[in-house]
Amino acid sequence: MSKQILNPEDVPRPLKPTFSQGVKFTDAKTLVFVSGQVAMDKDGNVVGKADAYAQAMKLLENMKLVLKEAGATFDNVVNLKVYLKDMRDFEAIHKARAHYFLKEPPSSTLVQISQLVHPDMLVEMDAVAAL
């Protein structure tokens, strides 16, 4: 399998180095779809109340465990969707993503939404990985 990052010269550069405009995979044999991950511990407790960075770090650790279960890593992620309750948390989210997605980052969409499944949750992410 080969991975090619797509950032054409005539397309605006990504605002942050934690995503690419596109990702092309060839010869991928398996796709892994990671459901929306949130900042919850294994007992269902919200982690990092009122702290978007802490929540992003926890949900990315949860995502890492799901990817590992499939035999994948963050290097295999081709698409990431981010759902934020407050766009003022944009910088905190990208700071957390930078721990996982600086080398050949995935394509990504980030949107603000009115609420998540629990009132203390500030961010949710889902992903697609290719193996």
Report residues per predicted region:
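N-terminal presequence-like segments and the immediate start of the first folded domain
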Residues: M1-E61, L65-V78, L84-L131
